[in-house]
Regions:
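Conserved beta-strand/loop scaffold segments within soluble protein domains that form the structured core
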Residues: 1-172, 176-179, 193-194
Length: 194
């Protein structure tokens, strides 16, 4: 696992009891993380990839398992990020949250596609997939495609995506309290990515 620290600014694995993990390189130059969270296990993973990263995360959740995965990136200049996530619920009562938050400045690009899968006869599942993007330049670009394949009726699954800039009223609020625009913007970005 030594190479993980070299690939990312931050990659934190917490609460790994009852988790089987395999990490592999993809042919396309990206990294694939596969996690199987066993019965009643819990996993929390935070990724803060550096520029020009391709990351795919696949979660498989057994009965009563829980997982939370966050991908947080700040693209500058011509950074190019590609993220793929798959949340596979194969056990009753499993829960997952995937949250992708990106800030894009200059000509940075983000391509995110995620999917939640729940097969027939699996019940009590709670799954969320959230993608929030902050564009700070007219040249920055975000493509987002959240998806769900839900084949069971007794589940609570949500997905959504948002793309926008910093609310001018927020910057005005900070300005009225004596904070310069650049400092206010940096504070807003830090809060957005936390």
């Amino acid at each position: 696992m030594q190479w993980v620290a070299e690939q990312f600014e931050s990659c934190t694995f917490l609460e790994e009891e009852n988790v089987i993990r395999s990490v592999e390189f993809e042919e396309a130059g990206g990294i694939l993380f596969c996690f199987c969270v066993q019965s009643k296990g819990f996993l929390r993973v935070d990724f803060r990839p550096l520029e020009n990263q391709k990351i795919a995360v696949q979660l498989t959740l057994e009965e009563g398992a829980e997982a939370m995965v966050r991908l947080l990136c700040h693209g500058r200049e011509r950074s190019d990020f590609t993220f793929r996530t798959l949340q596979r619920h194969v056990g009753n009562g499993s829960k997952s949250v995937v949250e992708v938050r990106c800030v894009c400045e200059d000509e940075a690009r983000v391509d995110y596609r995620g999917k939640i899968e729940v097969p027939e006869h699996i019940t009590g599942v709670k799954a969320e997939q959230k993608n929030k993007n902050l564009l700070l330049s007219t040249e920055a670009y975000v493509y987002t495609e959240p998806a769900m394949d839900i084949r069971s009726k007794d589940v609570e699954c949500f997905h959504g995506a948002a793309v926008g800039g910093i609310d001018p009223e927020v910057l005005r609020y900070f300005s009225m309290r004596g904070m310069e625009k650049l400092s206010a913007q940096e504070l807003y970005i830090a809060g957005f990515l936390n």
